[in-house]
Amino acid sequence: MRILGIDPGYGIVGYGVVEKLGNKIAYVSHGAIKTEKGEHFEDRLDYIYNQVNEIIEKYNPELVAIESLYFYKNVKTAIYVGEARGVILLAIKHSNIPFVEFTPHQVKLTVTGYGRAEKTQIQKVMKILLKLNEIPKPDDAADALAIAWCAAVSGSDYSSYKKNTK
């Protein structure tokens, strides 16, 4: 099963793709969608939406795993991330692919064994788990790989998930 992990944001959206074959999880790809600070916010959202669609089309995942929103001290940041997450979920919906959500705590606990792990720890662990030559960068992409990994090892049978309907 091919799984696309997404770490939502409005400045940088991380993505990571893994393939689960039996009990093995193989690395496929990772990267980041970066938006320009000076652009109008609606243009940034449009760009994120289009890029997520392209990633879905390119990697053809059977499942998307996305990080759920967590508490932000800055309300404005939380709203922006929530809006970016909304267009990402819309792209997933239009692609007719099932998705699952994980909290940052769940992902960190699953990947490192510690629910409050630092981003650098996530990067190092993902390098080891996926047998990569280098630490995955940016850290948003490493987080996305960790989200995909979390879906792959969670033990759920996602093949029985009902696909989104258009």
From Swiss-Prot:
Q: Which residues form the active site?
A: 7, 67, 140
Q: Where in the cell is it found?
A: Cytoplasm
Q: Could you provide one GO biological process annotation from this protein's UniProt record?
A: DNA repair
State the EC number(s): 3.1.21.10
Q: Can you quote a single GO CC term? A: cytoplasm
Is the keyword Nucleotidyltransferase in the record? no
Disulfides per UniProt? none
Q: Which Gene3D superfamilies match?
A: Ribonuclease H-like superfamily/Ribonuclease H (3.30.420.10)
Quote the subunit structure annotation.
Homodimer which binds Holliday junction (HJ) DNA. The HJ becomes 2-fold symmetrical on binding to RuvC with unstacked arms; it has a different conformation from HJ DNA in complex with RuvA. In the full resolvosome a probable DNA-RuvA(4)-RuvB(12)-RuvC(2) complex forms which resolves the HJ.
What is the name listed in the Swiss-Prot or TrEMBL entry for this protein?
Answer: Crossover junction endodeoxyribonuclease RuvC
The record lists the lineage as: Bacteria, Thermotogati, Thermotogota, Thermotogae, Thermotogales
Gene transcribed to yield this protein: ruvC
